Amino acid sequence: MIVTLTDQPFEPGVLVSAFCAGREETGAVATFIGLARAEQGAARALELEAYPGFTDAAITEIAQGAVTRFALQDVHIVHRVGVIAPGEAIVFVATAAAHRREAFEACDYLMDYLKSRAPFWKKEHGPEGPRWIEPTARDRTDAQRWDQEA
C-alpha cells in the first residue's frame, strides 16, 4: 500500500501502468483520477493545504480499513497539495482485488472519504479573490452511506 501527498504534478497513466505491472493473482484493478476544474472559467487555481504527518496518517488509516473491508490486495493513493491549475490531476486512487465488485466499491469508498472527510483545507482562487471550499451536501451524503453499510 502506498499513500503519497505531493506538491508536484503527477502523470496518472504512469501510475496506472506501474500499479498493474506483475499482478498475476489480481482479477481487477479500479482507478479514479480527479482533475482540478474551473467552474465555468471561474477558478484560476485550487489550493489544498494539509498537515504533513497528520493528513497522510489519516489517509493511510482509512486505506488500511478499506483493505480489510473489501478484501483488497493493494491500494495506491496519490493526492496533490499546494496550488493546482485547472486540468491538473489532484488525486489518483487505485485498488486491486480478486474481483471487480470489491475493487470498484473500495475505490468509491476511498474517494468518498477523500472528498468529504480527509483532513485537507481547500481554497479556490478566482476572479473575485480566494474563498474556502467546504464539502457539499452531496459529498457528505455519499460518504454517510458507507457508515450505514458498515
Swiss-Prot record:
GO terms classed as biological process: Mo-molybdopterin cofactor biosynthetic process
Chain residues that bind substrate: 35-37, 99-100, 115, 122-124
E.C. number, please? 2.8.1.12
Q: Report which reactions are catalysed by this protein.
A: 2 [molybdopterin-synthase sulfur-carrier protein]-C-terminal-Gly-aminoethanethioate + cyclic pyranopterin phosphate + H2O = molybdopterin + 2 [molybdopterin-synthase sulfur-carrier protein]-C-terminal Gly-Gly + 2 H(+)
Q: Which residues form a coiled coil?
A: none
Q: How does it assemble?
A: Heterotetramer of 2 MoaD subunits and 2 MoaE subunits. Also stable as homodimer. The enzyme changes between these two forms during catalysis.
Supply the name of the protein: Molybdopterin synthase catalytic subunit
User: What does the record give as the organism's lineage?
Assistant: Bacteria, Pseudomonadati, Pseudomonadota, Alphaproteobacteria, Caulobacterales
Gene behind the chain: moaE
